[in-house]
Amino acid sequence: MSPTISHKDNSRQRRSGMFGHALDMKSGPLPPGGWDDNHQDSVGGEGDREVLLGDVGPGDFPKAKRSYRAELSSILLLLFLYVLQGIPLGLAGSIPLILQSKNVSYTDQAFFSFVFWPFSLKLLWAPLVDAVYFKNFGRRKSWLVPTQYILGIFMIYLSTQVDRLLGNIDGRTPDVVALTVTFFLFEFLAATQDIAVDGWALTMLSRENVGYASTCNSVGQTAGYFLGNVLFLALESADFCNKYLRFQPQPRGIVTLSDFLFFWGTVFLITTTLVALLKKETREASVVKEETQGITDTYKLLFSIIKMPAVLAFCLLILTSKIGFSAADAVTGLKLVEEGVPKEHLALLAVPMVPLQIILPLLISKYTAGPQPLNIFYKAMPYRLLLGLEYALLVWWTPKVEHQGGFPIYYYIIVLLSYALHQVTLYSMYVSIMAFNAKVSDPLIGGTYMTLLNTVSNLGGNWPSTVALWLVDPLTVKECVGASNQNCRTPEAIELCKKLGGSCVTALDGYYVESIVCVLIGFGWWFFLGPKFKKLQDEGPSSWKCKRTN
């Protein structure tokens, strides 16, 4: 199942998660020690300092260790910026569930899934964000302020168009192409804002308190995603609002997507103006030289890293390692909605998972802290593959327990337990990969190196999900019942079948075909390539060190 609450990993990719379509966590917070203070130097150096307007000047920073209370305003600002970042991510994650309730094809869902790619690809333009800026305005504000203004204006404009795009007017079908382009731009802007905020976080806080940046990231984006996804889906549902929040039933929910977009667009504009006016970036006398030239240097460095035999082997293996999970992760949640499970109920099932998603990385990191973190990845993989079959069984069972348009409480308990077990295996693999990436990254270029490895890891989950969604319809076999000599292979044939008094009945659901094939591919990878993946741990440090030519 795909997640309702999705984090972005501290590479900083998130997620996301990636972000999936209904219940799956693509990633989570870093294990303890995953935040590297030395990354500060790679982003902006200690020459960049930010102070509130009217605070002490750059030369007045105390030498003694600073309490977090002294920087509470900066910590709260970071937290709020990450909450804002989570809003468009959560909204984008809710759209597939809304589309599924409108019976769009899985081919359309596959097309829309490209929306979740920008966070995995932001490494392509991150060097530009780091190096190009207006010195007088501030290195990070040069990107943060215009990006958030564009997001706010975009949201307000979209609030006037979204009902038409979703087909809520005059019974039209959803305009999936326009929705995909729109939310792809949303995700692109959110990813750009993420680059700017991550960089600002490392210099806004003192070196003693920079670790709070990771906490702000994880907590803030989770809260934002919750607001934009879980809370929105609940308040948008007329059934949910009438059942739990109203005394008199109404034909629609408390809020609409149009209302939600307008509200948050206004919040973006107001708060961005306040940040632009009240929060200043100041620099000490030292100036980072040749930053523009650094763009070219960074891209050359990335190419040099990926050409290394050990890194290339890692990339090829990790890009194929998640094929076995693609049907379970990308399609299951949508199938449950198709079978009648209310989308807002699926979203709310993620709420009790939050404590588990916080605790799991802490527990698992104890077993990945040694010299061979990939052993946990290898051991968890077959259990996660088997849970994919359990998910398929759950989808098959769902219509059999539906009663009077609803589902009994024991059904939701079983779904929740299945999701919890899935989270254990998912986090075991995720924390294992993060620990390995941190272990092998060349400390001299740690920020760039680890970001590259984590980007490839996240792409390894994105492309199989898109392919899995795209293949559901071609693999599904439907028969025309009630009209002779007809089939249901094309949309035109389906319409003709209906006109002749027949109906199209699914004889073989492509989801079940995919589930079995994916698990077989997954076990094939685990048996033949898994040992080679583990063997990467035996490579010496020299295999992972990049030889730079200056």
UniProtKB/Swiss-Prot annotation:
Say where the protein is mainly found. endoplasmic reticulum
Keyword match Transmembrane? yes
Q: Name the glycosylated positions.
A: N103
**What tissues has this protein been observed in?**
Expressed in brain at all developmental stages. Detected in hippocampus, hypothalamus, cerebellum, cortex, olfactory bulb, and the ventral and dorsal anterior olfactory nucleus.
Annotated keywords? Endoplasmic reticulum, Glycoprotein, Membrane, Phosphoprotein, Transmembrane, Transmembrane helix, Transport
Query: GO cellular component annotations, sorted alphabetically?
Result: endoplasmic reticulum membrane
Q: Which residues lie on this side of the membrane: Extracellular?
A: 96-113, 163-256, 322-344, 397-405, 531-550
Record PTM Phosphoserine, positions in chain: S42
Q: Which GO terms describe its molecular function?
A: acetyl-CoA transmembrane transporter activity; protein homodimerization activity
- Transmembrane ranges? 75-95, 114-134, 142-162, 257-277, 301-321, 345-365, 376-396, 406-426, 510-530
Intracellular or extracellular location(s): Endoplasmic reticulum membrane
> What are the GO BP annotations of this UniProt entry?
acetyl-CoA transmembrane transport
Q: Catalytic activity annotated for this protein?
A: acetyl-CoA(in) = acetyl-CoA(out)
Q: Which residues lie on this side of the membrane: Cytoplasmic?
A: 1-74, 135-141, 278-300, 366-375, 427-509
Q: Which PANTHER family match?
A: ACETYL-COENZYME A TRANSPORTER 1 (PTHR12778:SF9), SOLUTE CARRIER FAMILY 33 ACETYL-COA TRANSPORTER -RELATED (PTHR12778)
Q: What function does the entry list?
A: Acetyl-CoA transporter that mediates active acetyl-CoA import through the endoplasmic reticulum (ER) membrane into the ER lumen where specific ER-based acetyl-CoA:lysine acetyltransferases are responsible for the acetylation of ER-based protein substrates, such as BACE1. Necessary for O-acetylation of gangliosides.
Describe its assembly: Homodimerizes.
What the record says about family reads:
Belongs to the SLC33A transporter family.
Q: What is this protein called?
A: Acetyl-coenzyme A transporter 1
Q: Which organism is it from?
A: Rattus norvegicus
